[in-house]
Amino acid sequence: MARHPRWTLSQVTELFEKPLLELLFEAQQIHRQHFDPQQVQVSTLLSIKTGACPEDCKYCPQSSRYKTGLEAERLMEVEQVLDSARKAKNAGSTRFCMGAAWRNPHERDMPYLEKIVQGVKAMGLETCMTLGMLNESQAQRLANAGLDYYNHNLDTSPEFYGNIITTRTYQERLDTLEKVREAGIKVCSGGIVGLGETVTDRAGLLLQLANLPTPPESVPINMLVKVKGTPLADNDDVDAFDFIRTIAVARIMMPTSYVRLSAGREQMNEQTQAMCFMAGANSIFYGCKLLTTPNPAEDKDLQLFRKLGLNPQQTRVLAGDNEQQQRLEQTLMTPDTDDYYNAAAL
């Protein structure tokens, strides 16, 4: 198998320095070579264990080190998670993502996690989890249970990383991604814009992701959501064009990956989001809440989809059954139905 070309920091920096419209044109051309530009992947995200995380990530309201007013919750029961997954599927979601605020899962938690994955998979949904660091055995057990994707973000460049997190190393994050890949699970990994990093740091983050032995299949690009009580609560706002530029560079560097417009969409107007889609973003989380931070209300997403002529990505299911796709299309048109899914209500 031919190895994908490796990027250099100077090459990535040159992309960031291109005139914005020229950069967007290049990104859109590359995007159209690999994806239908009118199709957007729609996923649902559920926090299955909230708060009391021992890590010191300065952006995160779930850290036990910061007083953010977030109440910690224990790991949800298996049937609770499966009930949420059923509602997500009824609303038309094709991927169900589950997050737990852990440094790493304990061995006692693994049987529950395996049952959750098996149960969600049995519904015909793609599965994704983010649970912190994994060892080889844990990664393999999740793979054997049927986990499709594992999310573990690099957050920022190796050089800036120590300013944001001290309780786990950058190499530990890379090691987890390697274990996930070796277990046969697809990788979801990205970062955050607005931590106080420089453009060179943004280039460094994308360089790390694109130069992995196999680039992530899914690349979430988050805009910092500033939460009172966290050390980054008073950070400067991110310029919209700088964020759009980051999306475009990610698309150019990782042409076959899904680039997810992730946290921070609540802070973006429709024009900014539209330019992100033009820059190559082709995946979003659908629902009012992303773990513990706000996400645009569903009706706003539906209105924006209509204005831009975007559609939920077509679902590949067995025997030509397109019921799941039809459900999502109906939901996008009729947000007042019983199946209309509100992630924040779970």
Curated annotation (Swiss-Prot):
CDD domains: Radical_SAM
Binding positions for [2Fe-2S] cluster per the UniProt entry: C97, C128, C188, R260
Cofactor binding remark: Binds 1 [4Fe-4S] cluster. The cluster is coordinated with 3 cysteines and an exchangeable S-adenosyl-L-methionine. Binds 1 [2Fe-2S] cluster. The cluster is coordinated with 3 cysteines and 1 arginine.
Residue ranges of every copy of the Radical SAM core domain listed in the record: 38-256
Enzyme type, top EC level: transferase
Xref: SUPFAM superfamilies: Radical SAM enzymes
InterPro entries with a match to the protein in the record: Aldolase_TIM, BATS_dom, Biotin_synth/BioAB, Biotin_synthase, Elp3/MiaA/NifB-like_rSAM, rSAM
Subunit details: Homodimer.
Family note: Belongs to the radical SAM superfamily. Biotin synthase family.
PANTHER family associated with the record: BIOTIN SYNTHASE, BIOTIN SYNTHASE, MITOCHONDRIAL
Protein name listed in UniProt: Biotin synthase
